[in-house]
Every structure is written in structure tokens, then in C-alpha cells.
A protein has these predicted regions:
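Cytosolic juxtamembrane helix and N-cap/initiation of the first transmembrane helix
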Residues: 4-34, 57
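Hydrophobic transmembrane helix segments
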Residues: 28-71
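Non-cytosolic membrane-interface motifs at loop->transmembrane helix junctions
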Residues: 51-58, 114-127
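Juxtamembrane helix-break-helix junctions at the cytosolic face
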Residues: 74-94
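Membrane-helix boundary connector in multi-pass membrane proteins
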Residues: 105-122, 138
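Membrane-water interface at the C-terminal end of transmembrane alpha helices
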Residues: 128-147
Length: 147
């Protein structure tokens, strides 16, 4: 008897491969790395900075994301590397996806509490929050099948 496939199971099968995920990882992980380099070197024009960007508390808040974002980049880029070299990429991909979603959620939570709405900050952070949710079920399903 053939096992009945649900919509979620089919979605999980499609989202458990590195095929499309690697593009997301490359964009997000290289984007984070670029953002932090540009931020550290003060290369962004003032018009693109968040409100009160000179306030030391907000500067600290922004830099508090650095370890999280760099860990996202390291795990995401490593999972792409591991997938090409026969390694166990799924665990690192799952870590990267969860941390990416957390990073987006934390930023949006702050902007919500601050009562600030700027599409330039909301759109990318909304994508960081949501896009991993399409891949996490498939990665988890793939990990369950391997164990």
C-alpha cells in the first residue's frame, strides 16, 4: 500500500534540499557580512540609518545583533559548503534558519515597541522572520528520516 502524502509532507520534500535554500543562504549570509562590514566602517549615508543612530543605547542595541547575525552567516555558509562536500549540512541549515528567524523577530519586536515603521527596515527583517518558516519543516523531516 502506498503511503498517502499530505500537502505539508510534499512541501517538506521540496524544501528539504539545498537546491533553492543555498540561494537564500548566500543572499542572507553575505548580506549580513556586508552589512556588518559597512556598519563597522561607517559607510552608510545618514539617510539610510535608523532613527537616533547616534544614541549610544541604540548603537549598543544594533551591535547586540552582531554575534547572532555572524552565527547565522557561519552556519548558513557552512551548510552550503557541507552540502557540496557530502557533509551533514541539515543540522547547520536548521540552526541557521532558526537563528535567522529569531534575528528578524527581534528587530521587528524592537521597531514595534519603539512605534517606528520604516519599510526599509521592516521589509528585510520581515523576510528574515518569514522565509525560514518555509524551509524548517522540510529540514526537520529530512533529519527525522536520517535518524
Amino acid at each position: 500500500m502506498q503511503k498517502r502524502r499530505t500537502f505539508i509532507h510534499k512541501l517538506g520534500e521540496k524544501r528539504s534540499s539545498m537546491k533553492s535554500l543555498k540561494y537564500w543562504f548566500l543572499v542572507v549570509d553575505l548580506g549580513f557580512t556586508t552589512y556588518w562590514l559597512v556598519t563597522a566602517l561607517h559607510l552608510l549615508p545618514d539617510a539610510y540609518l535608523y532613527n537616533d543612530y547616534t544614541n549610544p543605547i541604540l548603537v549598543n542595541w544594533n551591535w547586540s545583533f552582531f554575534p547572532l547575525d555572524i552565527l547565522v552567516s557561519i552556519t548558513g555558509l557552512y551548510s552550503v559548503y557541507a552540502s557540496r562536500h557530502g557533509g551533514r549540512w541539515q543540522v547547520f541549515a536548521l540552526i541557521s534558519l532558526v537563528l535567522t528567524s529569531v534575528s528578524g523577530l527581534q528587530a521587528l519586536s524592537y521597531w514595534t515597541l519603539a512605534g517606528e515603521f520604516d519599510l526599509m527596515w521592516w521589509i528585510p527583517n520581515g523576510l528574515l522572520l518569514v522565509y525560514p518558516l518555509f524551509y524548517i519543516p522540510g529540514i526537520v523531516q529530512g533529519l527525522k528520516e536520517h535518524h
